Amino acid sequence: MKIAIVGATGAVGREMLADLEDSKIPEISLSLFASQRSAGESLPFRGKSMEVKAFSLDKMQGMDACLMSAGGAFSRQSAKAIADMGVTVIDNSSAWRMVEGVPLVVPEVNPEALRGIKKGTIIANPNCSTIQMVVALKPLLDAFGIEQIHVSTYQSVSGTGQRGIKELAHQVESLFRFQEPKCEVYAQPIAFNVLPGIDVVDSQGHCFEEEKMVRETRKIFGKPDLSVLATTVRVPVYQAHSEAVSVKLGKAVTREEAIKAMSGFAGLKLHLDDSHAAFPTPRAIAGDRAVHVARIRTPIDVLNSPWLQMWIVADNLKKGAATNAVQILEAISYH
């Protein structure tokens, strides 16, 4: 299978490369592309050193698939042209997610969206914070139905890419030197701070990250009227996103019934030890491909409640981006 990674030197592109290293796809002929600025860099793949080349449209000719993680503007400009060459494009940006007819896919959750996929299709990779939430909630949706979701996120700086990682590192260093931190990526310092909004804020006070979570969840679950209330927050963590989620199910359930429904679901790891030392944290799970769920509970002092609360953690560069994209590629490569 001839595969191109566009944006190979970025935070997600590097993880795509790492996930392809362990992929189920038996024979891979891989080409790496990035901007002119990053061209010439070498990256390892299956024991070889591979040169990253400057992207140009003609270099996509003859590819079977393109894993794209080069930002929304680039994707809007190039993805359709690449797909028109007969190349299947799996795009990690937000550019195509809500476009009618473009599959928005989490393989464990809505694999039916990949049925009948033909070469030359654009497939959208959902938002990182959306992916981990829908994986955790899908078995509950199937078992009990879902009427409403409340989610507050604690999102790491790697969600902004390498520049977010560097800004946090530089600001921490500056503060320890008693220097004023410079803000180039975020509007306020992120070091030792919490920023209560991600991306552009609209006239109604909703930020774009929240809009993504609401609309993508509805599309993936096939429930266009589902009530989703989201508050997205940037925190001074390098890698992995966390979420506090409350979900109103279609019926009252016990903690035990919820755990039974979630147990064994693909890509989901339940942490049932409720001691503080056992809780999954961003630091503990960084680099892992699973979605981790803990603190599963029903509301305090409320009997027969349809509400369920939980803590969800996943690596935003892995399952939240690269791993999900490679899983999509694995699924379509078997057609």
Per-region residue spans from a language model:
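Active-site-proximal catalytic alpha-helix in oxidoreductases
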Residues: 167, 188-196, 238-243, 247
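C-terminal active-site/capping subdomain that shapes the small-molecule cofactor and substrate pocket
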Residues: 226-335
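Glycine-rich beta-alpha junction loops
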Residues: 36-38, 128-129, 153-160, 194-201, ...
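A glycine-rich, Thr/Ser-enriched phosphate-binding loop motif common to dinucleotide/cofactor-binding enzymes
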Residues: 121-132, 205-214, 320-324
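Generic solvent-exposed, charged/amphipathic alpha-helical segments
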Residues: 17, 214-218, 259, 263
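N-terminal Rossmann-like NAD(P) cofactor-binding subdomain of oxidoreductases
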Residues: 1-190, 225-227, 278, 285-287, ...
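Helix-loop-beta segment of a Rossmann-like dinucleotide-binding subdomain
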Residues: 117-124, 193-204, 310-312
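Oxyanion-binding "anion nests"
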Residues: 191-238
